[in-house]
Amino acid sequence: SSSQTSSSQTSSSQTSSSQTSSSQTSSSQTNSVTVPLKFARYIPPKHFELTGDTQKQSFIKLVLPLILAVNDELLQRRKAVEAAVETNDRNMLDQWAVLYRIDPENFNDIELAERLLRRVDTIPVALALAQAAVESGWGTSRFAQQGNALFGQWAWTESAGMRPLAASNERAVVRSFGSLLESVRAYMHNLNTHQNYKRFRDARYRLKPKAEEAKASRLAVYLDSYAEIGQAYVKKLLAVMSSNNFDQYAEAKLG
């Protein structure tokens, strides 16, 4: 499991569909992929019997809808922040600041708004898919199977997760979740709040006007601190995104 700092769980956001164990993605190879509104709570046992490309496709069908759903939640949050900025609602901005681990007392209205807009934003779909694939072994790791842990997030309280067979810190556990969706939420909140990923967020802010398919590979280079292997981890993410054509999902939508 890759080494990574833990983050506090985001407050539960509402996702409007029922939980199911299967999902289908469009066969289109364009960036207008439509993904049915179906979510898996956990990785089904049959997934572990699959091999090769069949297992990879199964994993994508399980995880892609979850990534899109949480990105949609983040877009709604961003709109709420932008609305608070427009109306000069400092009380609401302060509440968002606390959730996104910013001390509001340190900033005036303009400074706080900019810092929030650097944090409350989506994660490129191809990048999230690649990290889930690498961190969970395409959904085959025992942490994914037993703890719904797709992204190898560390926690420091034993009751919060599962102990790895080898870890550089004896107190470290891989954080477990009640569902796969919770795992995706926590992963995105971690990238959006932890100090280790400030360079990632700053680069995302600069790339905001660019096309979505151009962002994943350009932002991956800022995730060297996600794993102990550093730049080798970045190279692995880039290889997974490229060899599996994950950019085809850059503009994917739930529908």
Tell me what each language-model feature is:
Residues 1-9, 14, 19, 24-130, ...:
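Catalytic cores of secreted/periplasmic lytic hydrolases that degrade extracellular macromolecules
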